[in-house]
Amino acid sequence: MTTEHSQSKKTIDFGFSEVPLEEKVKKVKGVFDSVAGNYDIMNDVMSFGIHRLWKRHAIELSGIRPGNVVLDLAGGTGDLTKAFAKRVGKTGRVVLADINESMVRVGRDRLTNEGIIGNVDYTITNAEALTYPDNTFDLVTISFGLRNVTNKDKALEEIYRVLKPGGQLMVLEFSKVTQPLLAKAYDFYSFNILPKMGKLIADDEASYQYLAESIRMHPDQETLKKMMLEAGFDKAEYLNMSEGIVALHRGWKY
């Protein structure tokens, strides 16, 4: 399992490849520049459309109330931002943050067109170097984005720093399937069908191949839980969804 516990190494995984540390951000940016216009379709293809149910369940568990301040990291096209903006109301605030300008632009245009305005900010942000003061947010979410972060340990430490005491991190991410037969079927789909769907939908087989590989290289459920605790979180737990195709990790700062 590849983790970022030791950043003394000079290379890191980019899917199944090893690239120099400083190149991963650029390569990930290239992937999401390519898929930004078809991102929602991509999520449907990767999850059989079930990502909406996973996100809805995460939102219900968030406990967000009017007046809360939320940071939606790797916010993409704004699915979670939209839901949280409605829940925090006029007295709250949601920040849609993404390292990729193309994704921020798609999210901003989509939410503006849907009338989600007035309590949402948009920013290009690196999760490893958040520009917010300590103790700023009631909730930080990162949905289907942590696996693309170069230094996950640093990002988790930064998230912990900007959370208010009593605040919560929610990580919704593809994880390790717990049922052996389903795991084999999902692997076959990910590596044999998903890239071909990417070619068909977006004329981009390589980006979809990377996305499949990035899921395989992401820390498993227990490893990510341990990483959260080592980053400073006082409590961490996870909930498997769809037999572990996705896991929802939650961490609290007391």
Curated annotation (Swiss-Prot):
Q: Does the keyword Methyltransferase apply?
A: yes
Source domain of life: Bacteria
Instruction: Output the Gene Ontology terms for molecular function.
Output: 2-methoxy-6-polyprenyl-1,4-benzoquinol methyltransferase activity; demethylmenaquinone methyltransferase activity
* Spans through the membrane: none
The Enzyme Commission number assigned here is 2.1.1.163, 2.1.1.201
* Claim: Repressor is one of the keywords in the record: no
NCBIfam families with a match to the protein in the record: MenG_MenH_UbiE, PRK00216.1-1, PRK00216.1-5
| Family, as annotated | Belongs to the class I-like SAM-binding methyltransferase superfamily. MenG/UbiE family.
What is the annotated role of this protein in its UniProt record?
Answer: Methyltransferase required for the conversion of demethylmenaquinol (DMKH2) to menaquinol (MKH2) and the conversion of 2-polyprenyl-6-methoxy-1,4-benzoquinol (DDMQH2) to 2-polyprenyl-3-methyl-6-methoxy-1,4-benzoquinol (DMQH2).
Protein name in UniProt: Ubiquinone/menaquinone biosynthesis C-methyltransferase UbiE
| Annotated source species | Hydrogenovibrio crunogenus (strain DSM 25203 / XCL-2)
The gene for this chain is ubiE
